[in-house]
Regions:
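Short acidic, gly/pro-rich beta-turn/loop elements at beta-sheet edges
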Residues: 43-45, 61, 75, 115-117, ...
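Surface-exposed extracellular loop regions of Gram-negative outer-membrane beta-barrel proteins
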Residues: 8-40, 46-50, 165-170
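Outer-membrane beta-barrel signature, preferentially recognizing the C-terminal barrel domain
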Residues: 10-12, 56, 60-62, 69-125, ...
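Transmembrane beta-barrel strands of outer-membrane/channel proteins
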Residues: 1, 33-37, 65-69, 78, ...
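Gram-negative outer-membrane beta-barrel transporters
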Residues: 24-27, 31, 121-124, 143-213
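Short, solvent-exposed loop/turn segments at secondary-structure junctions
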Residues: 39-41, 55, 177
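Membrane-spanning beta-strand positions in outer-membrane beta-barrel proteins
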Residues: 24, 30, 52, 56, ...
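Outer-membrane beta-barrel translocator domains and adjoining extracellular loop/strand segments
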Residues: 1-5, 43-48, 77-82, 90, ...
Length: 213
């Protein structure tokens, strides 16, 4: 007798079109409207508008505000995956697409050799797709969380040591909570509250044809 393994194949048709424009209200104020159209053969069509404002009081400072809506269909993996490893992960063919409303506001600046930015973001997601533990045998299943509230602050500071060498350090504070039907909000899994990053970038400006970080 031999061993046989059945391979399952899945596919999806997903088309997206994105258009954007830049309007200059005056020398300091810029408006960026955009629109994204998506069609999924299973989940239908959606329109996601977005509007951004940028104000530049001087040549070294920019204030930015953005607001928009979003749509995200489940991926093939989220729908059908069957992964058996240290942790078993299973898809869910009954998943619904995510819809979201989000806004952010921040400031960017440059002073001499230093530069930086700070941005606050606030996202509200309906039917957030997330993998949750089942409570037995290290099994995780993708499911929809009725509502996800993801907000936080991103900050970055950099210094140009020379025309080829740049140092950058960043920090992200994340407050990510979700609520199932009939349950109180709880912190979402696998999302670090604080993330720190530091990198050194080198660019030889094509003298030798390489760059690194």
């Amino acid at each position: 007798a031999g061993l046989s393994k059945k391979r399952e194949s899945y596919s999806a048709d997903h088309v997206a079109v994105y258009v954007s424009d830049l309007w200059q209200a005056n020398d300091r104020l810029f408006i960026t409207p955009s629109l994204r159209f998506e069609h999924h053969n299973r989940f239908g069509s959606s329109l996601s508008p977005r509007l951004g404002l940028t104000y530049e009081p001087d040549s070294h400072t920019r204030f930015k505000v953005n607001y928009g809506k979003g749509f995200k269909a489940p991926t093939i993996s989220e729908l059908y995956i069957k992964l058996h490893h240290f942790v078993n992960v299973y898809g869910n063919p009954d998943l619904e697409p995510e819809t979201s409303r989000s806004w952010d506001a921040g400031v960017e600046w440059e002073r001499g050799k230093s530069f930086g930015r700070v941005t606050y973001f606030d996202n509200h997601v309906k039917n957030l797709i997330d993998a949750k533990p089942s409570g037995r045998n290290n099994d995780w299943f993708y499911q929809n969380i009725r509502r996800g509230d993801i907000r936080g602050v991103e900050s970055e500071w950099g210094y140009r040591v020379s025309d080829r060498l740049t140092f950058k350090a960043s920090h992200v504070y994340l407050d990510a909570k979700g609520a199932m039907i009939g349950k109180m909000k709880a912190r979402l899994d696998n999302r670090a509250r604080n993330t720190f990053t530091a990198i050194i970038l080198y660019d030889d400006h094509e003298k030798y044809g390489w760059s690194g970080s």
